[in-house]
């Protein structure tokens, strides 16, 4: 067998990969808009956001692992036409994601001051970080659910629909919140209602 690029597989890779890449890029742009809004509160708020965001990075890895598992097992079962198993995979991943995220999110909130203290000793930085946690740790399980459905669809080879839904659902809502509602209620807590 010769090593060569097979156009049929290359097409499939692009059909799944390009929309996923576009989605990731657009979500990162909306995160930059969120960061810009946080920056308007000054350097202490920026430091609190940066510290809390670093901690959320660890939480997101845990949440995203269920999305990756769902995508992998869905694609395997889709390939062998075991469609009932695909439903079971999605339901199990949803339950596990919600349970793990609620436990980890609660832990992050409970131990938030200690975790934020790793990044800064300043009381105001910790205060801002905890304000962000108070709005985001409770609802972070939604992040897992929002990622699971697109992950399952990608596992079946559909990537454009999840991209459109994520851009409208996550980015669209966040942009409307940041530029439409946030200017009338300028507080860090109100800003983070748009998250995740």
Model-flagged regions — what are they?
Residues 28, 109-110, 118, 141, ...:
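Conserved catalytic core of Hanks-type protein kinase domains
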Residues 9-16, 38-57, 124-130, 158, ...:
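Interfacial/gating helices of multi-pass transporter permease domains
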Residues 2-33, 37-38, 58-62, 66, ...:
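Hydrophobic faces of transmembrane alpha-helices in multi-pass small-molecule transporters and flippases
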Residues 172-182:
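Transmembrane alpha-helical segments of integral membrane proteins
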């Amino acid at each position: 067998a010769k090593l060569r690029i097979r156009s049929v597989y290359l097409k499939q890779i692009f059909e799944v990969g390009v929309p996923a890449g576009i989605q990731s890029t657009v979500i990162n742009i909306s995160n930059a808009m969120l960061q810009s809004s946080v920056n308007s509160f000054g350097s202490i708020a920026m430091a609190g956001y940066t510290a809390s965001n670093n901690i959320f990075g660890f939480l997101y890895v845990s949440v995203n692992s269920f999305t990756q598992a769902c995508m992998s097992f869905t694609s395997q079962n889709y390939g062998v036409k075991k469609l009932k198993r695909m439903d079971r995979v999605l339901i199990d991943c949803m339950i596990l994601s919600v349970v793990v995220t609620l436990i980890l999110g609660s832990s992050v909130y409970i131990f938030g001051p200690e975790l934020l203290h790793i990044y800064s000793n300043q009381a105001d930085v910790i205060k801002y970080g905890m304000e962000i946690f108070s709005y985001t740790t409770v609802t972070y399980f939604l992040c897992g659910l929002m990622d699971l459905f697109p992950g399952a669809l990608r596992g079946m080879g559909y990537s454009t629909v999840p991209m459109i839904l994520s851009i409208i659902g996550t980015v669209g809502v966040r942009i409307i919140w940041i530029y439409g509602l946030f200017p009338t209620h300028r507080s860090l807590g109100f800003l983070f209602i748009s998250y995740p």
